[in-house]
From Swiss-Prot:
Protein family (similarity comment): Belongs to the complex I 49 kDa subunit family.
Record's GO cellular component terms: plasma membrane
Principal location: membrane
Protein name (record): NADH-quinone oxidoreductase subunit D 2
Record's catalysed reaction(s): a quinone + NADH + 5 H(+)(in) = a quinol + NAD(+) + 4 H(+)(out)
Assembly and oligomerization: NDH-1 is composed of 14 different subunits. Subunits NuoB, C, D, E, F, and G constitute the peripheral sector of the complex.
GO function terms (MF aspect): NAD binding; NADH:ubiquinone reductase (non-electrogenic) activity; quinone binding
EC numbers for this chain: 7.1.1.-
Keyword field contains Cell membrane: yes
SUPFAM superfamilies to which the protein is assigned, alphabetical: HydB/Nqo4-like
Native source organism of the sequence: Beijerinckia indica subsp. indica (strain ATCC 9039 / DSM 1715 / NCIMB 8712)
Length: 396
């Protein structure tokens, strides 16, 4: 049969596929086992989050952010709180800032642990998830002890955090740090120099720095291609400008470089956590956890039991909510997956006029056709794993 008699065939990758990382439906056009075209179909987890936020007070809108990147929920809350605080021109007390940074770095560990171990699982390594999830369980217990919830924390508030940390939690997080670094070394021993792991990741899903910028990449995806771009250093927020940490940068822009960067970022996160713990334990770190602006923050429970005015004020804040001055603002944080941004427009009322969410995974997923072109079908799993996508924030 001549060449014209052959044609490419199309297969569905997902949404049931275990390596699709959620509800991704990828329509692949294959020439034999070589990918000619990859067409992502998204929207299977769409809940209309941005529209729902327009019908909620600022406090009621906060829990929606936990459900975007549900692997590291507090990082998303952080961006929303920063946006509101910019419009209100509201400072955050020192202790509140340190607690926020501490739990954002715990979120980074949660996200990178899940990504590294499932990326290994996607290409056939079964041991890393068993080791990684043991550590994630400990971190989720820290989340639970601080906020009362393992995943959807709803812990950050405009002006600070909801409640102070319980006794002994700081000591327990400190005691977690050193053994965790040993687990990182063990994981790296399993994967970094493993011949099969390298064959499956090196020179797969390569993207140049110029191409990464053009496609709107951020986070690990641009650092893997050679740019030392991290919002915690480039545009410091909270107390990141006081903290000492390094930005790992790759050279080749492939799946293996992105894996190595996430591995090193976990060590840097532990370094940041230790500095936060030291500062929280010092005299400087003592004090209020939330700004005492009673137009925005509710009175303490002890006050409510004694004062009728405090009770009325609490009732007003939790029913009507607080008003935010008219204006528009963009606030972004360095989430584990990249630059997570919130573009907020206020009309001066108690509900947002518009809240646009900039999800890093969305920009990364749209490059799947470019990244997987002319690769083998088996490489698609490795590429999706290295993108670190979560469909809560892609579909919103």
């Amino acid at each position: 049969m001549d060449e014209a008699g052959f044609r490419n065939f199309t297969v569905n990758f997902g949404p049931q596929h275990p390596a699709a990382h959620g509800v991704l439906r990828l329509v692949l056009e294959l020439d034999g086992e070589v990918v000619e075209r990859a067409d992502p179909h998204i929207g299977l987890l769409h809940r209309g989050t941005e529209k729902l936020i327009e019908y909620r007070t600022y406090l009621q809108a906060l829990p929606y952010f936990d459900r975007l990147d549900y692997v590291a929920p507090m990082n998303q809350e952080h961006a929303f709180c920063l946006a509101i605080e910019k419009l209100l021109q509201m400072p955050v007390p020192r202790r509140g800032q340190l607690i926020r940074v501490l739990f954002c770095e715990i979120g980074r560990l949660l996200s990178h642990l899940l990504n590294i171990t499932t990326q290994a699982l996607d290409i056939g390594a079964l041991t890393p998830p068993l080791w990684g999830f043991e550590e994630r369980e400990k971190l989720m217990v820290f989340y639970e002890r601080a906020s009362g919830a393992r995943m959807h924390a709803n812990y950050f508030r405009v002006g600070g955090v909801h409640q102070d940390l319980p006794e002994k939690l700081l000591d327990d997080i400190w005691n977690f740090c050193e053994p965790f670094l040993k687990v990182c070394n063990d994981l790296e021993e399993l994967l970094s120099y493993n011949r099969i792991f390298k064959q499956r990741n090196v020179d797969v899903g390569v993207i140049s720095l110029d191409e990464a910028w053009t496609r709107g990449f951020s986070g690990v995806m641009v650092r893997g291609s050679g740019a030392a771009w991290d919002l915690r250093k480039a545009q410091p927020y909270e107390c990141y400008d006081e903290l000492q940490f390094d930005i790992p940068v790759g050279k080749h822009g492939d799946c293996y470089d992105r894996y190595l960067i996430r591995m090193e970022e976990m060590r840097q996160s532990v370094r940041i956590m230790k500095q936060c713990l030291e500062k929280l334990s010092s005299v400087d770190g003592k004090g209020p956890i939330i700004e005492q602006n009673h137009k925005v923050t509710p009175p303490r429970r002890s006050e409510m039991k004694r004062s009728m005015e405090a009770l009325i004020q609490h009732f007003k804040l939790y029913t009507e909510g607080h008003h935010v001055p008219a204006g528009e603002v963009y606030a972004a944080v360095e989430a584990p997956k990249g630059e997570f941004g919130v573009y907020l427009i206020s009309d001066g009322s108690n509900i947002p006029y518009r809240c646009k969410i900039r999800a890093p995974s969305f920009a990364h997923l749209q490059a799947i056709d470019f990244l997987s072109h002319k690769h083998m079908l088996a490489d698609v799993s490795a590429i999706i794993g290295s993108l670190d996508i979560v469909f809560g924030e892609i579909d919103r």
